[in-house]
Amino acid sequence: MKPSQSFQSRKVGIVDVKLGLNITIIEPSNLYGCTIGDDSFIGPFVEIQSAAHIGKDCRIQSHSFICSQVKIGDHCFI
């Protein structure tokens, strides 16, 4: 890449997501059609697909991939 060229950084993609209270999402992440419970943390490079459910007080760490229709209970560390 030449110094004069620019690039577009990837940000958080959130589409049709039900978010609880006090959620932290670190970019870049891709969340769509899922539910995230209260007091949860989503790290960078995480993808959570449609109909997945993340419980309360969960930590989903970097580079995690949560497939469609997966249910993760409360107080889990992934």
Regions found by a protein language model. Give the residues of each.
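Structural signal for interior beta-strand "rungs" in well-ordered beta-sheet cores
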Residues: 6-78
